[in-house]
Amino acid sequence: MRKFNIRKVLDGLTAGSSSASQQQQQQHPPGNREPEIQETLQSEHFQLCKTVRHGFPYQPSALAFDPVQKILAVGTQTGALRLFGRPGVECYCQHDSGAAVIQLQFLINEGALVSALADDTLHLWNLRQKRPAILHSLKFCRERVTFCHLPFQSKWLYVGTERGNIHIVNVESFTLSGYVIMWNKAIELSSKSHPGPVVHISDNPMDEGKLLIGFESGTVVLWDLKSKKADYRYTYDEAIHSVAWHHEGKQFICSHSDGTLTIWNVRSPAKPVQTITPHGKQLKDGKKPEPCKPILKVEFKTTRSGEPFIILSGGLSYDTVGRRPCLTVMHGKSTAVLEMDYSIVDFLTLCETPYPNDFQEPYAVVVLLEKDLVLIDLAQNGYPIFENPYPLSIHESPVTCCEYFADCPVDLIPALYSVGARQKRQGYSKKEWPINGGNWGLGAQSYPEIIITGHADGSVKFWDASAITLQVLYKLKTSKVFEKSRNKDDRPNTDIVDEDPYAIQIISWCPESRMLCIAGVSAHVIIYRFSKQEVITEVIPMLEVRLLYEINDVETPEGEQPPPLPTPVGGSNPQPIPPQSHPSTSSSSSDGLRDNVPCLKVKNSPLKQSPGYQTELVIQLVWVGGEPPQQITSLAVNSSYGLVVFGNCNGIAMVDYLQKAVLLNLGTIELYGSNDPYRREPRSPRKSRQPSGAGLCDISEGTVVPEDRCKSPTSGSSSPHNSDDEQKMNNFIEKVKTKSRKFSKMVANDIAKMSRKLSLPTDLKPDLDVKDNSFSRSRSSSVTSIDKESREAISALHFCETFTRKTDSSPSPCLWVGTTLGTVLVIALNLPPGGEQRLLQPVIVSPSGTILRLKGAILRMAFLDTTGCLIPPAYEPWREHNVPEEKDEKEKLKKRRPVSVSPSSSQEISENQYAVICSEKQAKVISLPTQNCAYKQNITETSFVLRGDIVALSNSICLACFCANGHIMTFSLPSLRPLLDVYYLPLTNMRIARTFCFTNNGQALYLVSPTEIQRLTYSQETCENLQEMLGELFTPVETPEAPNRGFFKGLFGGGAQSLDREELFGESSSGKASRSLAQHIPGPGGIEGVKGAASGVVGELARARLALDERGQKLGDLEERTAAMLSSAESFSKHAHEIMLKYKDKKWYQF
């Protein structure tokens, strides 16, 4: 029978309804129909599911380790469970209740884990499947769980409670035993006070029948399980935090709240054998040391060849104010105090054997910190730490923005790795990472993926995210180009931010050319080139831009002289720029107002730039009339054009980073010219601003920079040329510059006059309902809110090669600008020829007059060719700029060609294109060059879109959106037919809005917590293959052999004493537990899950084989019995027949 597919029916319905609505929404005449494009994406290509979670577990609370499987488990205060094996093997699970995890216990080498939560629930997890699941849960109803202990190779779990009682749970059935240790029976009968909650439970390593119970008040009890009474009671004045056994079972050690350690002989309960205050000051006259901070945990580990290790956390003296948390390692007479960067949550000592009654031979200590995981090598002098292979440093500085790139050039990851490998710290342990359990998944994904994170300290990190793993590749520190403030009085002018003046807000990256551009919170932009060579930059290239919406009448020292629009360093002086040519940061107007001053001060000393990303140009917005610059809201870079553009709520600026010149510096209103649909006017005269048309096109004196500013970063350190030749060259360049300047001004004025005559297209009405913009806002987390139409911010920028006007017959380079009021404006770019002329002739920038309108702030723009394929922005392939090349080869590489993935290159396109525009409220597909609205889709009415991306999937493209109401939606292109609409995650904080992003091949991610990245997929194919891609946590490993008891110990009973716990705790001897004490909750696995927890795949196969043999044997026995019965039946039939023949002719009276 054929399976009924409801989604195909929905496809048909949505296709029919959308086509009907699209016919109504099309704004062009019926006779001018758009050519049909065959769309291949259907709803069955989409499915939403989480893939993996990377990063450090947020708010960790518990730690456990399986010494045989070599798997580490971390629980958190939010109920999350993170499991780590070998590098690349990670797993994330979540308790539905969200209660804090207070303790974790592995069933060692069984592929199972017990978690105890703060809501007094115990859960049994099956780790023998790629996605662990809960098999059983046990909810305690009348008592609070405080401590759990599961002996090695035992199925009985001891559970201590706040009331001081101990209950016993069978981990196979997850039911309570009737055996209970009551607190009033454990303590002295004469004692009148309650001993407090149970803080420790452990069995004697040499006698499983003896249970050591630690109570918070300071009482320790050795309980005999068989006789059900206390053998010994140990009392100390200070509260107990933890207890640990010596492996011989004759001594144990306790840590106390006054910073002391007490060592007790099992048979001497009167007083401790030894009292140690590790960090206490030893006073004279034998007095007791001053009390210290509590020792929260202690471990006692022995070695065959030397003194035992005593490892503890806490216990520092109270006078060490401000000292960082410490882990103390005491070995023999030496004491090492290891300082940690964060508070210690828990620690575990990794030992060679899982058996508690053998020499432990510790080799490492895992320390779980509040924001880090540290592994200390105990076998090497100095106790170095292991280099952590997990991606746990995402939060090293808080993440402020995030970008995700799938299907990158194949040479990118090796290139980034090679330069990042040189940044690694020295001094790590030489041993391999000891947590190496599990196996990698067999992923079918082979395309490279890169995640870029921007951070609050100004750093940018590149991560290899291929095949659902994460590994740091390279770290860039953008703050290196700025002067650091040494004291509060010398702080830079970062009044627009309280702290983190270097924080990254926006990242624009071209993977093909490897050009990187970042925008920071202090209204600064830095452009980087990638190089494999180390260079020394004598002077950091720098531009200052005066970007202002409105200028009040402010008196300046120059009187009526207006300040220049851009402030390039060095002006037009052809001579090399000395370091002091950087603008002074103390500039101010005559009435004390800060003016023409950037927020940060660029270094004026030579800068050594290591291989990797090297500074090409620093651009800063300056203070104007006492007002700080507004933070940047949008950013775009294009390597083919050599341009970078950025905008904020004041306006837009475009910079030629090859010539180090400002090409465009306009307020947002001036972009409209006479076509402003809101009819806005500046509220005061603008003395320092030129008319809008001229301001857009005019190239000022300051925009042409000396040749030295156009050189590569190595120019400053290159050998000087002959002075006569240099003078001639400078004179020649000045002549060329003067001519090109005059020509550019003439062209600019002509274009400006033309641009003013261009009106708004008649088919796009400017009187759209502005009230729909109530949700419009900047995507930046700290940008000033836009509450008036006059504060229209630039929200999206896109370089492309397309039709700028209706009358265009061929595409040309241009910039599309989107604003927060839903307007799209098009700016034409006239680029000079490539090669040396590109460095000498100016780029002409002019408005096209094209204005398009949507509801809500513009988020994303892209372009399709006539076949529906995505037209990517033009780019220049990467090349090494710091290596001299042959002239003809250099000319060849200097030519910038736009590259397209469509069948026909963009130079040959004569047919129409489609512009895809996504705003906070709707999406439109505009046909070019006619500028008719081909398709329109209202994405949301009651919410707004936080992120929209045009992405490739299954050899096609679609629009993917994430809304503030938690819905993830996808639409086909170009018809904007709905394909997916799933409620996933509501917007709970700005962190999600700031970091959520889609990329190609159905991948997406966001920052789920301050320390973790959550990746998800909306591709059906990836969801189906996810099981294969995930790693396996459990691998069949033989349990190590138990330690040899030795001849004499076996003869005289000195070895470990075993205990038949089944007989002691089973229902037959101890009875049933009270039903009101705890409630059993079966997990999704049910009875089959129990089998899975007890055995797993290998065990099940063995059992199945055994069952098959038994079944075969039984079948054989049955066959034999059947044959015997058949033979007996035949014999009986034969005898009956003989008797019948014998008496057949006889009469009845003859018998």
UniProtKB/Swiss-Prot annotation:
Alphabetical GO biological process terms: exocytosis; Golgi to plasma membrane transport; positive regulation of exocytosis; protein transport; regulation of exocytosis; regulation of synaptic vesicle exocytosis; regulation of synaptic vesicle priming
UniProt WD repeat ranges: 61-94, 101-140, 145-181, 200-234, 240-272, 294-336, 344-378, 400-477, 505-619, 633-695, 794-851, 860-934, 939-983, 997-1020
Pfam families: Lgl_C, LLGL, WD40
Coiled coil: none
Biased composition regions of type Low complexity, renumbered to the chain: 17-27, 712-721
One cellular component term from this protein's GO annotations in UniProt: extrinsic component of neuronal dense core vesicle membrane
Disordered: region residues: 14-34, 555-595, 674-729, 881-906
UniProt feature, compositional bias: Basic and acidic residues: 881-892
Family statement: Belongs to the WD repeat L(2)GL family.
PANTHER family referenced in this protein's UniProt entry, alphabetically: LETHAL 2 GIANT LARVAE PROTEIN, SYNTAXIN-BINDING PROTEIN 5
Protein task: Plays a regulatory role in calcium-dependent exocytosis and neurotransmitter release. Inhibits membrane fusion between transport vesicles and the plasma membrane. May modulate the assembly of trans-SNARE complexes between transport vesicles and the plasma membrane. Inhibits translocation of GLUT4 from intracellular vesicles to the plasma membrane. Competes with STXBP1 for STX1 binding.
Name of the protein: Syntaxin-binding protein 5
Organism: Homo sapiens (Human)
